Amino acid sequence: MNKDVQQAPDFTEDRHLDPLVKEFLKGINAGKPVESLSKEAARQVLSDAQSSVQVDLSGIVESEQTITENGLSVPLTVVRPQGSAGSPPCFVFIHGGGWILGDYPTHRRLVRDLVVASGFPAVFIRYTPSPEAKYPQALDEIYAAVRWIARNGARIGVDGSRMALAGNSVGGNMAIATALRAKREQGP
């Protein structure tokens, strides 16, 4: 190990940051490193961090549906721009969180912002995280949901023949893996 490795700077004192961001960072940095926590404690840290900030959730309509495809039941949350009609193209959102953390409540604000900014509905896939799911269960659930949306999008008010895949962090990884699988299997 390199003895010259330096400690990361304390960004909580960065004069360029908004005071609310500094306060948020102080709270995050006050706890133990997330990798040292149990999965339950780590999930709670993320949940608490997201719920500690009041956010604008206006401009959207949410609905939930559990679909079954290829023998897998997968819960979906459909997030539409308020006042939208018909079956427009959509984007499928796959959340990050190191395969272990995250869910719709921790990503609700991000999905809302993407829906409002783009004007298109999102379909949030509530895949089973690790360690409850063993590889490749989460990817199988995501691909099953994408196949179902492609075939049945009108049932949830979207055009499943015109969808994009998106995700943050590990969700981006799984979006790419899903696109590659669709190409390999000549699927949606």
Show the residue positions of the predicted features:
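A glycine/proline-hinged amphipathic helix-loop "lid/cap" segment
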Residues: M1-V78
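Conserved Rossmann-like nucleotide-binding pocket used by diverse enzymes
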Residues: S63, V123, A166
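Short, low-complexity Ser/Thr-rich regulatory SLiMs
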Residues: R80-G83
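Short beta-strand element of the alpha/beta-hydrolase
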Residues: S87-G97
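Conserved phosphate-binding and hydrolysis motifs of nucleotide-dependent enzymes
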Residues: H95-G97, Y127, P131, G167, ...
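Catalytic nucleophile-loop/oxyanion-hole region of alpha/beta-hydrolase
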Residues: D103-Y104, L110, S118, V123-R162
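Primarily recognizes the serine-hydrolase "nucleophile elbow" in alpha/beta-hydrolase
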Residues: A144-P188
